[in-house]
């Protein structure tokens, strides 16, 4: 776990630097202490059983949120601060998505990814789907239980799981030539996550 603590404390420190925080070394030390305690907990062992989930990363982000919430920051501020720490890491992924969006079969790639992710999530039990429908040019699903939500909720910050929920919206925002993503509801602040992934070609028929 020492490697993970070092990795994520560096990301947290970068987020604090980017946002002009003071007493950064003290804040990073507090974060490292909190994250170590979380990694050493029985709850971490219970949560760290899902192959499709990087629980070390999830806990690291929860620890960041708890540190910032303790300092009085609001949810929107916390989400922006935490995301700023991961900006450089996400840049390469965004570039890859924009390259995929140039390809004529971009929707097919998105479709295959969704189906594979669904199958893997069902297999390891990390996400419970009310339904997952695949039709011509569209995937629609509804998620009623999600271990991302459960972990954030355990630490009393369910609404901040939006950090993970919005990654779908961010990803599809780079596939605008071929894919339309519609989020009807968000599980971090509602009863379920209800999304549609649509082939834009089918909308034009």
Question: Which residue ranges define each predicted feature?
Answer:
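Short, charged/polar, Gly/Pro-enriched secondary-structure boundary elements
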Residues: 148-151, 201-205
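Amphipathic interaction/junction segments at domain boundaries or subunit interfaces
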Residues: 56-58, 62, 66-155
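Short, hydrophobic/π-rich interface segment
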Residues: 130-188
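C-terminal edge-of-domain segments
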Residues: 191-201
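Short coil/loop linkers at secondary-structure junctions
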Residues: 22, 74-75, 158, 178
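Short low-polarity hydrophobic stretches
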Residues: 64, 141, 172, 195-196
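Charge-dense, low-complexity intrinsically disordered segments
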Residues: 51, 104-105, 159
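N-terminal, charged low-complexity regulatory/assembly segments
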Residues: 1-68
């Amino acid at each position: 776990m020492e490697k993970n603590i070092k990795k994520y404390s560096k990301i947290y420190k970068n987020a604090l630097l980017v946002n002009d925080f003071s007493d950064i070394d003290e804040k990073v030390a507090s974060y490292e202490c909190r994250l170590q305690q979380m990694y050493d907990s029985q709850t971490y062992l219970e949560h760290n059983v899902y192959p499709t989930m990087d629980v070390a990363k999830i806990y690291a982000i929860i620890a960041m949120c708890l540190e910032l919430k303790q300092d009085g920051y609001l949810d929107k501020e916390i989400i922006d601060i935490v995301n700023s720490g991961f900006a450089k890491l996400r840049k390469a992924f965004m570039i890859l998505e924009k390259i995929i969006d140039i390809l004529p079969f971009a929707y097919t790639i998105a479709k295959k990814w969704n189906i594979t992710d669904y199958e893997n999530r069902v297999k390891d039990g990390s996400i419970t789907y009310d339904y997952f429908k695949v039709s011509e040019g569209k995937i629609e699903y509804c998620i009623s239980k999600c271990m991302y939500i459960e972990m954030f909720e355990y630490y009393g910050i369910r609404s901040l799981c939006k950090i993970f929920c919005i990654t779908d919206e961010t990803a599809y925002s780079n596939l605008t030539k071929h894919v339309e993503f519609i989020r009807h509801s968000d599980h971090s602040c509602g009863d379920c996550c209800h999304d549609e992934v649509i082939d834009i070609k089918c909308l034009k028929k």
